[in-house]
Each structure stands twice: as C-alpha cells, then as structure tokens.
Amino acid sequence: MASDGTSPLPGPDMSMKPGTGLSPFSALPFAPPPPVPPDQPLWEPSPQPPIPPVFSPSNPLLLSAFPSPLLVTGEGGPGPSVAGTGQVIVKVKTDVGPAESSQTQNLIVTQTALNWIPSGAPCGSQEGPPPPRYVTASNVKTILPAVAVGVSQEGLAGLPLQVLPPAAQLAPIVPLEKPWPGTQATTMEGGPVAARKPSQGDLAYASKGVYENYRRWQRYKVLARTHLSQSPDVEALSCFLIPVLRSLARLKPTMTLEEGLPRALQEWERTSNFDRMIFYEMAEKFMEFEAEEETQIQNAQLMNGSPGLSPIAPLKLDPPGSMVPEACQQPVYIPKKAASKTRAPRRRQRKPQRPPVPEAPKEIPPEAVQEYVDIMDGLMGSYVDTGKTEEEEEGQQEGAGMYPDPSLLSYIDELCSQEVFVSKVEAVIHPQFLADLLSPEEQRDPLSLLEELEQEEGLNLAQLVQKRLLALEEEDAQTPPSCSGAQSDSSPSVSDEDEDGGQRRRPSPGLQGAAGIVRIGKSASPGKQAREIHGGQEQTLGGPAGIHKDGNNLPSPSSWDVQLELTASQGMPVLLGMERKMSGKAIKQLSATQDGHLGRTGSPGYYPVADRNPEVLPCCWQEDPQHMRAPNFDVGLTEPVPLQGLGLEKQALTLQIGKRIGGAGMLTRGREPPSVVSQKGSSRAVRGDDRGPGMLQSYSQNHSPGAAGNLDRVSLSPGLWLSSDMGAVGLELPLQIETVIDSIQDEACRREDQALNSRNSASLGPRKNTVPKDVGNSVIPSGGPDTTAVPEKRNPCSLPGSLMASGPGLRSKEKISKENQALSPKTIQNPSDLWAEACPPLLPTLVSSTLGSSKDTLIPTCQGNLLIIGTQDASSLAQTSQKAESRGNLLFPLLENIDQVTILDVKDDSCPQPGVSKDSCLSNFNSYNLQGEGREDTVSSKPTDLVPLQDNQESYTHETTKLTNGQGQGSTSPRWATRDAYILRETPIKEKCTSADRAKRRETEKEEEDEELSNFSYLLASKLSLSSGGLPLSTRQASGGQGIVKTSRHSTEVDDLGQPSPPPKSGKQALVGSPATVVERDQQGAQFNGSGQKPLALGMAQLPQPRKRRRDGFVTSKRKKRRRSQ
C-alpha cells in the first residue's frame, strides 16, 4: 500500500482521507505493476498495460460485487497471510449468442501471498511491494452486455481457504459514477482495446445511477422483507434505504449493516407521509422496471431459444459468518437499448414488445369505394322511387287491413282542407266532451257523456248551436255573483234599425258577464282580476277597491265583463276581436286612421253598441296612440251629431246601468215624438230619425253595487252620463256610501291644489281642480222623475282647426245644425237611468269613477253645445277614484288649432249643507293628457251661474273654491293648441262650507283671483303660445232620483310651472240644491236659440231666478284689459 496512508481505490462517496477503509466491493488482484515513481500520485494511471488478454472487446466481462472484504495481495499485512503462491480462478461465463454455446473462461491470478484486510484495518501501515491494480466492479459493469461471473479462490494444497470476517462492513454500495481513470486509460492503450468504438455501456453513463439504484433496490427489498414482512411499504422502504444507508456510511464508515438498518427504520417511521410519497413513486418506477425486465427476459428466451438462461433471481445475502460458496452467480440481464429503457418510466408509454401488426393502407381500396357507390346508388334509387310506389304501398297496407275504408283517408283530407267543415266540426263538438278530455280530474262519467252525445246525433246543426248557446247561458247563470252582482244575459238581441234605412243592424252581444273582458261571447268569471298596464303604471281591478301603483285607491269594480259589439260601418275599422282576458291583457288599440273616425260626414255610419247586463259596467275601446285603462262601461252609440263650427261628428254614448229602475232611456237625435220602450233584461241603443225631437228609450234595469253603489269602484268617462238613483240601489259592497264619502272628503281636504300643467294636461283628480270647458253655451237644468229633457240649440262654439284622432275620432266638417236642444220633461221616465247625447264615441277607462249616490245630483258633462243639468240629492253624494292617474290614455281625438275656447265659471252661493239639500251639482272632470302627465282632480261645484268667460283669443277659467269631494277620472286627452287660455287657480277651501261661508269667502277669492290673474296670465300665455295643449273632453256624470244631468264641455287644463291648484276641500257638501239656478251667459256672440228661450229649470220644485254674479263686470273688464295688452 502507499506510504502516505491513502486508500488506493476510494469509493465515489468516500473522500480520500488517510486511514479511510476500502470499499467492500470485491476486486481481483492482478500481477503487480511496476513500482510507482515517488512523484506520481496514487490516483494517476499506471503505465503498465493490461495483463490478461482475456479482457478483450469481444468478451466483455462483468465482475459482480460481493459483500466481502477486499482481497488484496502483499506481504506484511495485518491480516492473515498465506505463504506460497495463491491462485484466484475467475470463471467467466459469456453469452455469445444463440448460435454459440456458453463458454466458461478461467482466469488464474497468481500471487505470492493473499492477505485479508479486516474491517477497520488501517491501510497506511502496510509496507511492501507496490499496491496491485484493482479492477472494480463498477469499471467492468459499464462494459455491456451482461455476463455471469463466478469467482472462486483456491490455494495450494494444504492451505485452508480464507474465511470471511464475521460481519460485513457497511459502506456505500453505489458504484463509481465515473470509471476509474487509470482503468480506462489502461484499456485505451495499445492492442486492439485502444481501437474499439464506444459501446452501449458508454452511452449508458447518464442513466447509470438510476440503474444501479434499481439494483440496490432489488437487494434492499429482500433485506426489508426480513424486517417488515407484513408491511406494504417494503418497496418504498427499500427505496428509502438507498440514500439513508449511503448517508450513514458517509457519517460512520465503520458502521455495519446490522447497525445501520435499525437506524434507517427509525428514520422511516419519523418521515411524514408527504415525504414518503417520493419513495412510493420511486418504488413504483422500480416495480415497473422489474416487471419489464422480466418480460424482456422471457421474450429473449423465446427469441433466442436459449434454455440455459434462467430468470432473474434477487440476490440473497448470506447470514453473517457463512462461507462464500465456491461459485456465486448473479445473473444480470441488461437490455440492448439501455438508454431508451431508462427514459421509458418517464413517458410511461412503453409497452411490451409484440409482433408488429400490419397497418391498414392509407388509400381506400377501390373495392370499398365501389361498394360505397353501389350502396348510395341503391339508397338514392329507392328514395326516388318512393313517390311512385307510395300509392301502391298504401294500397297494400289498406289491403292488409290498416284502413278499413280505402277512400277514408283521402276523404278526411278533403274535408279538413275546407274551412267551413272545420268550423262546423268545432260547433258540433260538445264542449263538455272537450272539457272532460282536457280536464286533469279523474272523476269523470263517460257513460253520461256518451248518452248525451247519442241524443245529439239526431239534431241538426242549428239545433246543436242553439243547444250550445243554452248551455253557455246556463253556465253563465250558474257563475257565482261577484260583488257587483252581475248576471249574464244570453238572449240575443238586435237593436232597432238606424234612421238611414236600417240596411245594417247592430246585434248586441248575446253573452255578457262581470269579468274584465272586452269580447263578443262568453264572459269570464267575475272574481277574476284585470290588470291594466299603462305608461309603467299598473292598476289591479278586483277586490273591494282597486289599488293604484302609487298607493291610491282606484274606483274599479272587482272585475268587469265588458261585452262590446261593434257594428260594421263605413270608415270604422274597429277590432271586434279585442279582448281583455283574465288579469293581464290590455285592450287592443284601434287603428288610427281617418277612415277609423266614427261618424264621418256624409257616411251614415253604424257605431259600436255595448249592450250589456243591467248590473255590470262594461268598458269601451280606446284610441290608438296610447293604452287605455280598464274601461268598464257598457255604451250604446247613437248617430253622430255634427258640431257647428267644428265639423265634428259626435257620437252619443249611452251608458246602460241599473236594473228595472224605471223608464229612463237613451236620448237620441230624431224628430219622432217621444216614446218609451221597455225591454226585458237587456238594454238597447235606439237610433231615431231626424223627424222629431230627441227620443228616449227606457230600460228596465237595476243598479248594481258595482255599477252605482260603490264609489270607489265605478269610473265614469267622457260622453257617458250616469244616473244613480241611490234610493233604488241595493248596496252589496263592503264599503258603504257614507264611509266612502267621508274618506274621500277627508282626503280631499288634506290635499293641496296643484297648478295647472303647461302641457295642457286636463286630468282631474284630487290634485288639481279644473273646470271643464263648455263647448256648447246652453245650460238646461232638468229635474223631476217625469221630466223630459229637450236639448236647445243655441250659440254654437266654433273651434276652427282640424281634429287629429287615431282612434274613433271626430273630424271638423260641419257646424252644429241644431243648437241647444232642450230635453222634454215628458220623455224622461226614470231619472236614475243614464243618458248620452253629443258625446264622442270614445269609451273611457277605469281610471276613476264619479258616481253620485245621492238622489239629486247635478253633473255637467262635456263635449257639445248642450248643457243639461239635473238636480239630484246631495245627501249621499260621493265621488271616488282618488289619485287615479291616467297617463297616456287617449280617449279623444287630437284637437289642434283651437283659437276660441269657452270656459264656464261655475259658482253657486246658495249651496246647502251636505245631507240637507235635495239638489246638488256634481262636476266631475274626466281629464286626459296626451303626454301622460294627467292629474286627476275633481271639481265638484255648484253651478248656479254657468258663465262662459271667453273671447275669441282668451280663455279664463274661474274655478270656485267651494268644491265637493267628487273626483274625476284622469286620462290622457288629445292635444289641442289652446291660444291664450288662462286658468285661474282657486284658493283651497276648508272642510265644511256652508252658504254663509261661501258668501264670506267670495270676497277673499276675488282678491286672490285678481292677484293670480295678474301673476299667471302672462306666464300662462307665453307658455301656451309655445306648447300644444290638450283638449280634455271631460264628463260630469251624476245620477239621482230627480233627473239626468249632462253637460258637454271641453275641460281645459293648463299646468304651468307646476303651480298647485286648490283641491276640493269641502266635506260632504253638495254644491247645487234643488232651487239652484243655472244661468249661462254667452260672451261675444254666444246667444240663446232663435226662439230666445231661456234655460229651463226642470224639477219638482220651482227653481228661483238666478242671482247676478258679483264679478261679472270685474272679470269682463279684466279680460278686456288683458286682451288689449296682448
């Protein structure tokens, strides 16, 4: 050994330190090389060439490592030495190929002495010949392919074999990562070795560490099974022992394997599961290597046909103290492509080698192409021939019994193609049968239905239709009554012929009910709710009182079944199919065309007639530009009455409400003598001819609470006059009249009057007071149960300009031919009925309801030159529809370019106390705003003097502050350019206003009006000159026991700068008593009729002479001054 004490062959994990033990790998000592020069280090390559020629490239050798001390040569060693020559016979068994048999070569190494180096023996103390060359196993292993090496030791005769030490030294087993430079340099020198090319082993250096770790894993796996036989972590523990034992060998090289293994197990137990995952993955790879290696060995045996090669057996360590067998073999198989094998675990795509399967050619063989073409040709041919063979196939199927009648299918197809047949089938099919089929209920009686169907087989079509109608009628009769007590009237009726010859007849709908539906046919159940969505606002109808979206109560009945039957007339494209079903559908809008105007000049049109049940308020159609709120009136339209100066053809609408109250009817225009016609169950709209005065038709109807009894649920509309004789009304609603009156009046007193809108929105409600504009300058009070209102023709109001209407509208073509027709006292039979005259054929919406519950109520209504005032009792007067906004509801045509407006100033100083007077005047305003900014307000005033204060260019509206609780329904009205229309805001009034209070406050009103006139006149004038106004045709309706009141007015409302107008603040106060006097004064050409007849005061009590207005001169002078200033 070297004198410096360093190890001649340190391992890869051992530093070259003096006294370091040698690696336990067995090495074979060869012939001693020549002495090393003193200046040459031990690790330098030796200049001596390799000794034995057996280590040739043709026979690569692989010397396996043995767990035994190194066998070294030399003399004077500390271990036992043997004198004489020793031989080390190395038997090398090479695998040369399938054609050659295995060869065994014996390598005999002679040496003078064999010395064992015991464990821990110092190497530097040895002296003697130079150290021999050692060929380590790592250097030889790199030379592939695998060979089995057996080494045996032999001594001279009589010399015992050396025995292994009792314990093997624990040292790192990882072979040298790099070959010892001396060996490689030696092999490259001289002879054929220097000329050889790099073998596969040289290319396997990169994966050499993984392979050797794999071999150690195989050995440690046997060792781990001895300690952890039942543990499933044997493979992972074996991987863990590789680095741990290496580290222990570095720390303490003299530590034996038995000492290091318990420490390694302790470290394994301390390791966390997460850290163990690395070794589990490594063990998984090694197990894959092992399985693949076994598969390759078996494949090699099969391919080579070498039965002598045994499968790999793991190396078993001998127990300590056992002798090394004479020939210890460790078969090792290294695949030819070692480099590619080591990369296989990373890819995990390597599969066992199998014989290659012939791949399909990339080209489609022509046979397959031809077959495909043949198949497609066959399919296409059969498809083409299908049309030709369909009849034959059908004939075959019919012959097989699929169709018992061959011509049945064709016959059915022919019948189904006829619309008449389909309609007949629908009429013939029993509705109960369809209901049973579609009913989800299981309890059905098919036998009874079968019997009923058998009975119907003998009936013809007419009988079946009649039976269906009767069945529907019975169903309607069985419908549970709603709060309005509506009943169905299924008797078909046809109104009288028109005065133009009666070429067309207007049939009224046969079935009517109380659900919010506008349709021709069966009515829906009254308990359903109708929802009206308009302008982002939604109101729900159904319940004790309608609830508006803003929280205000809407005077709408629970649900109205509106039956609107429209007669085909020239220029009236009215949609007969418009319906409001259930709770959400808005009524379809009518198309807006000039031909759609009702009552065109020169065309005796036939107008919609709403014949309905006596206890239901139906709704009417709406105009096209905007949606309409829930209309709930049944209206009969009479012939048009041309407006003089406007050329407007007005349609009289008749609202038929009540049941069997008395002989009150619809006022029609004609020259026939008055007549009373009683009818059963259903109302009729009768049209008279032009041969006589207005003809009234009486109706036997009875008010229902939904129609006249509920103040919160009934809405009136323009052109409709309601007569509510509350004495004949049996209230069935949860809200009583008095309670409603109190609540409305209390709320009205809390509201402040709001200014008129600059957009001329004439919506009336509890927010603003607006006096309707009187188009006709005649006022005819009518009263008494048996009085007849004869309209007087006088003082036509000329409104120049064209009317632009999108729905049934009015066009200015001619002036009013008859002015101020007076109602004859003989015609009106029952003052509780409703009358309509000179109103546009535009039906209102359920926005607000003004239905007087008193006996004597005076309600002036607008639109026309006729003002009919009937005194009613104000004790039970009530008006509802609080804050019912009517934005966007267009019920009237657009009136534009209106230069002259006559506005009535309604005042009365002799208003009796609420509940005391017999007569009252209820002014209900139905205002409509085209811009959707309608304000709902009700001006309920006592018109003792109705004075039109208007010149040709200015319009002053003096509103009285003595206003009752009445509220009008607000809706949008067509715009009209109102020039110089001034509306004065009145001061709010208090809760209860007596006649004395009114007289005292008139002086205060004067002063306030003067200030208001001076302040707002110029502002309003400037505002109105720039913006278009709205012409609201407001309806003032009331009903009582004394007569029917109607006033035709144009209610003008201008909302400028948002100035509030005083709301009605009076309590339960009626504004007009029975002795009230109505005086109408014409201004600038407004005259009475040619006969000079004064307004008639009709009623049971004599009406006193009208008092002179205190402010007539003042107002006139003020107007003149303003007109001059402009």
Curated annotation (Swiss-Prot):
Q: Where is the composition biased (Polar residues)?
A: 962-975
Q: Where does this protein have compositionally biased stretches of type Basic residues?
A: 338-353, 1106-1126
List of residues that carry Phosphoserine = S973, S1022, S1025, S1027
Predominant place of localization: cytoplasm
* A UniProt-annotated Pfam family: NUT
The keyword Nucleus is assigned to this record: yes
GO CC annotations? cytoplasm; nucleus
Localization annotation:
Cytoplasm; Nucleus
For this chain, the annotated S-S bridges are: none
Q: How is it modified after translation?
A: Methylated at Gln-1042 by N6AMT1. Phosphorylation on Ser-1022, Ser-1025 or Ser-1027 is important for cytoplasmic export.
Keyword annotations from UniProtKB, A to Z:
Cytoplasm, Methylation, Nucleus, Phosphoprotein
Instruction: Give me the stretches of Basic and acidic residues compositional bias.
Output: 987-1005
Map out region (Disordered) in residue numbers: 1-56, 334-367, 475-515, 537-559, 664-692, 755-810, 932-1014, 1032-1126
Start-end of Pro residues biased regions: 30-55
Q: Which residues carry this modification: N5-methylglutamine?
A: Q1042
Presence of keyword Nucleus? yes
Q: Which family does it belong to?
A: Belongs to the NUT family.
Q: So what does this one do?
A: Plays a role in the regulation of proliferation. Regulates TERT expression by modulating SP1 binding to TERT promoter binding sites.
Q: What is this protein called?
A: NUT family member 1
Gene name in the database record: Nutm1
